[in-house]
Structure formats: C-alpha cells, structure tokens
Curated annotation (Swiss-Prot):
It is found in: Cell membrane. HAMAP family: Undec_diphosphatase (MF_01006). It comes from the Bacteria. This is Undecaprenyl-diphosphatase. Belongs to the UppP family. It is an enzyme of class 3 (hydrolase). It comes from Thermomicrobium roseum (strain ATCC 27502 / DSM 5159 / P-2).
Length: 278
C-alpha cells in the first residue's frame, strides 16, 4: 500500500463510519474492486484511532457532562434521576451486546469478510446486507414517530439500540445505520438518534481499536508503515469530524432517504459486478 491509497482509505473510513452507509463494506469493496493490497493490522489500528479521535474531539463537552452527572448520581444514590446520567448508563448497557458479540465472533467474521476467506461470497453477503438494511431504515423512517428527545432516553432504549449495534459487526449493516434505525423505531427524532448513535459508538470503536492494538503490540509497527499509519490516522480523524458535523446538521432538516437510496444502489451495483466477474 502506498501513501495515496492510505489517504483514500482513511477518508473513506472517516466519512462512512459516521454516515449510515457502512464503513466496513466500503473498506472491503475498494481493495477488491481496484486490486489493492490488504491494509494490514497496523493500518486497521490507525483507522480506529482516527475515527475515535474524531468522535472524542466533537463530543468532549457532552462526555464531560455525562461523566459528571453519572458520578453525581452514584454519590446521591439516584443514578437515573438526571437525563445525562441516564444517558451514561444507557451507553454502558448498550455497549454490552457489541462487546460480547465482538469477543466471540470477531475472528470468524474477520476471516470471512476481511482476510479473503469468503472471497466473492463475502462481497455478495455485504451487498445483500447493504440492500436489506437500507429497506429496514426506510421502514423506520416511514413508521417511526420521531418525537422523542435524547433527554427521554431510558435503559431499555439503550439496550435495544445496543443490540442493533451488535449487528454492525457484519459488513454492510453499518454501525451508525443500525443504531439510528433502531432509535427511529423507538420514536426518537433524527438528530437525537444520530447523536446517541455517535456517543454509543465510542466504547465500540475504542474496544475494536484496543483489540487490534494489542495484536499490533505483539508484532510491532514496521518502520516502512509509520508514514501510512500517520496518514490513516489524520485522514480518518479529519473526515470523521466533518462527517459527524455534517450529519447532525443534515438530519435537522432532512430524512435519511439519500443514504437509503445510496445503500440500495451500491448493493445492486456490487451484485452486478460480482455476477459479471465470475
């Protein structure tokens, strides 16, 4: 992989991680389409570090408020009285499903989708998931009431959205897409759904990055990959921050229809490409 490819993949990761169109699907499809080399462990760590930096930089004030309220609730023995404290508990509970699923299934999914084990079949599955979850998001847009605010978030909501987040281990589902979809079904307004999706994603992104980092510590970072590492971190962080800002503002006025159309169109195009490639 060269620096240009690293920058492109970093931009793709940063943009698609926070838009409901599946970052993992794009990171699988791009190297497959253009016959690029496998990014490798070190670069995967760079991408996770970049997107984690983006979401922490954007929501640092929210995180401080949530942390203060959470600890204050524990001290007063009223952990669910304050909405910010409830949000903190919802993030904790909502992070458990993805954590457990990742612990038990990550290696199997990684081998099939990311390490070439699934071949063209993995692309077909990814394409189908892009399409299916696009239709599910359309159903959420159509039937969700969209009146609830983030202050009304409860622990049950956190668990339901967390279960949806666990599905995003499968490329094509989209972590932000699945969590925003679940939140819309629960009646949350679009901006609130996106905001909770991003905050809930912090432990998931950090956990995935930590697992990859532990593996990298064992192997070490080769000197020739250091420039690629920095390029991946920087490009993913900058575009990730911009993607968060864009989507939160976009959803104040518009629906997710453009992303639904994109998901379905991309899935269909990929199915056609695979069919002709065989």
């Amino acid at each position: 992989m060269n620096v240009w490819q690293a920058a492109v993949l970093g931009i793709v990761q940063g943009t698609t991680e926070f838009l409901p169109i599946s970052s993992s699907a794009h990171l699988i499809v791009l190297p497959w389409l253009f016959d690029w080399p496998e990014p490798g462990l070190a670069f995967n760590v760079a991408l996770h570090l970049g997107t984690l930096s983006a979401v922490l930089a954007y929501f640092w004030r929210d995180l401080i408020q949530i942390g203060r309220a959470w600890f204050a609730g524990l001290i007063r023995l009223r952990p669910l009285e304050d909405s910010a404290s409830r949000l903190g508990w919802a993030v904790i509970i909502g992070s458990l499903p993805a954590g457990l699923a990742g612990f038990f299934l990550n290696d199997v999914i990684d081998h099939f989708f990311h390490s070439g084990g699934g071949g063209d079949t993995a692309i077909v599955f990814t394409s189908l998931l892009l399409i299916v979850l696009g239709f599910v998001l359309w159903l959420a847009e159509r039937y969700g009431t969209r009146w609830r605010s983030l202050g009304e978030l409860g622990l049950r909501d956190g668990l339901v959205v967390g279960l949806a987040q666990a599905l995003a281990l499968l490329p094509g589902v989209s972590r932000s897409g699945s969590t925003i979809t679940a939140s819309l079904f629960l009646g949350f307004a679009r901006p609130a759904a996106a905001r909770f999706s991003f905050i809930l994603g912090i432990p998931a992104i950090a956990g995935a990055g930590l697992l990859e980092t532990l593996k990298l510590v064992e192997t070490g970072l080769p000197a020739e990959q250091r420039v690629l590492f920095v390029t991946g971190v920087a490009s993913a962080a900058i575009t990730g921050f911009l993607a968060i800002a864009f989507l939160l503002r976009f959803l104040q006025r518009y629906s997710t229809s453009i992303f639904i159309v994109y998901r379905i169109a991309l899935g269909l195009v990929l199915l056609l490409v695979v069919s002709f490639a065989r």
